[in-house]
Amino acid sequence: MQPETQSSALPAYRFSIAPMLDWTDRHCRYFLRLLSRQTQLYTEMVTTGAIIHGKGDYLAYSEEEHPVALQLGGSDPAQLAHCAKLAEARGYDEINLNVGCPSDRVQNGMFGACLMGNAQLVADCVKAMRDVVSIPVTVKTRIGIDDQDSYAFLCDFIDTVSGQGECEMFIIHARKAWLSGLSPKENREIPPLDYPRVYQLKRDFPHLTMSINGGIKSLEEAKEHLRHMDGVMVGREAYQNPGILAAVDREIFGADTTDADPVAVVRAMYPYIERELSQGAYLGHITRHMLGLFQGIPGARQWRRYLSENAHKAGADVAVLEQALKLVADKR
C-alpha cells in the first residue's frame, strides 16, 4: 500500500494530518513537514470541478511535502478518474476520496458525507480511480449519517467499497455526521465519539488498512489508538498546536532523531517565505498557519499577537518573524 518513508520501516499512514478546508493549504503543509519528516500530509479537499474547470493550479505543492496525498471531492467516477490521473502525474503519493465532510456546500455538489448513503456509487468511484492509477486510493468517511448509524450499516458500507471498489484503506472519523441541522464545526463536536466501534471495525475487517480520526489531542492518545488501529489521523490539534508534531518521528515512528526545535523551524521557513513573497504571496497567508507553534511556551501569546498585527502589512517579510521570535526567545 502506502510507500514507506525512507528513514523508517513504518508506513507513513501510521500518523497523518487530516485534510482541513481552508487550513491545510500548501503553505501549511510545507510548515508541518519541517516539524515531522515522516507524517503523512493531506491537501485540503479539492473538487473535481475545480481541477477540471478552474483557472488556478489546484494541484500545486512543494516537493518537500512528500509523502503527501490529494483529497478529492466528487461523485462522478469518470471525472474522479481523470483527476486521479492528473494527480499521479504530478507526483502525489495517494488519492483520498472525501466521504466524510457534512457541509451544505459539499452536499449540494453531491460529495462528502452524503455519499455514505450510496455505497455502490462510492465503490464505483474508487474502482474508476484504481483502474487508472498505481498509487493508493483511499476513503475517508464517518461511522454513519443521520439515522443510518447502526454498526451493520457501517459494515455494509465498508464491505461494498472494499469488495466492489477494491479499496484497501479507510480513514474513519469516529463520529457520525448529521447532514442537516448542524454546521460543519458542530458536526466535529456534537456527535459523540465512538472509538470502540472503529476498533471493532478493524477487528472485523483485519485484511483492510484502517486509520482512526476524531478528537485526538496528544501523542499519548495516538499511541493508545495504535494498539488497535493501523494508523492515526490528527486534525484540529495538529493545526492549533503544531508543536506536538515535533516528537512524532521519534515517538510514533521510532526514528533515531532529535525533536524539531520550534525556533529552528521558523527560521527554516525563511527561504520558502522569501521565494513565495517574490512570486506575489502575502506573508500573512503563510504565517497564519504558524500562530500556534509556541503553544504552552512563555511568549506564545506575544508571538501570536505580533504576527497577527504585523504580517498583513504592506511589505511585510521575514523580518516580522524574526522580531516575533525575540518575544519568545527572550522568555525561553
Curated annotation (Swiss-Prot):
Belongs to the Dus family. DusA subfamily. Keywords: Flavoprotein, FMN, NADP, Oxidoreductase, RNA-binding, tRNA processing, tRNA-binding. This is tRNA-dihydrouridine(20/20a) synthase. FMN binds at P19, M20, L21, Q71, K140, H173, N213, G214, G215, G235, R236. The record marks N98, K185, R188, R301, R304 as: Interacts with tRNA. GO terms for molecular function: flavin adenine dinucleotide binding; FMN binding; tRNA binding; tRNA-dihydrouridine20 synthase activity; tRNA-dihydrouridine20a synthase activity. Its EC number is 1.3.1.-, 1.3.1.91. It comes from the Bacteria. The keyword RNA-binding applies. Disulfide bonds: none annotated. PANTHER family: FMN-LINKED OXIDOREDUCTASES SUPERFAMILY PROTEIN (PTHR42907:SF1). It catalyses: 5,6-dihydrouridine(20) in tRNA + NADP(+) = uridine(20) in tRNA + NADPH + H(+); 5,6-dihydrouridine(20) in tRNA + NAD(+) = uridine(20) in tRNA + NADH + H(+); 5,6-dihydrouridine(20a) in tRNA + NADP(+) = uridine(20a) in tRNA + NADPH + H(+); 5,6-dihydrouridine(20a) in tRNA + NAD(+) = uridine(20a) in tRNA + NADH + H(+). It is an enzyme of class 1 (oxidoreductase). InterPro entries: Aldolase_TIM (IPR013785), DUS-like_FMN-bd (IPR035587), DUS_fam (IPR001269), DusA (IPR004653), tRNA_hU_synthase_CS (IPR018517). Its cofactor is FMN. SUPFAM superfamilies: FMN-linked oxidoreductases. Catalyzes the synthesis of 5,6-dihydrouridine (D), a modified base found in the D-loop of most tRNAs, via the reduction of the C5-C6 double bond in target uridines. Specifically modifies U20 and U20a in tRNAs. The active site is at C101 (proton donor). Pfam families: Dus (PF01207). The keyword Ubl conjugation does not apply.
